[in-house]
């Protein structure tokens, strides 16, 4: 049985070492999606992931997929795309539209874990300066992008979407370059996918990840508004 977290007592998570092996990383249920709960969770390497009709479920998988910003892998074809000038990359231009797009089912009739409760919670974190979006715009339309959380010198990627070829990859590459400029040391990708591996993601043990967060989030920078044109420098 996984522990039930009482939201009346404030955020108090069990150690991530107690997370289940099957399903990988399930740690606890209950709690709340308020800013204090989310900040406490992310600082400990924990994130919410659940479907409509389920209680809030908290996860911390082992191993953990991460990207170190200086290890971004840009393929020849992606670099060619990045050098074109048919798109515009914006930061925090329309966060709500990005999270809504990420919530759209990938297949007709499919579900989504980005429930209305999740959307409302992260829009609130965006208003507080913790959650950010990176957006690829083509011909005046939102073509792809991603959103995530920034705490200290760690960025936690949540979800991405693409309506045009390579639109999410364009946003991801510009995000990583922007994180390097801000001296971020780690981009958490949560779960392993081939898509992330192709961009330089690699797995590290959960205990190593949690220790790194202890260092990177100790320097808790004030939440910041990212400049909308902060990722628009030409790609070389």
Identify the function of each model-found stretch:
Residues 1-236:
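N-acyltransferase acceptor-side catalytic subdomain
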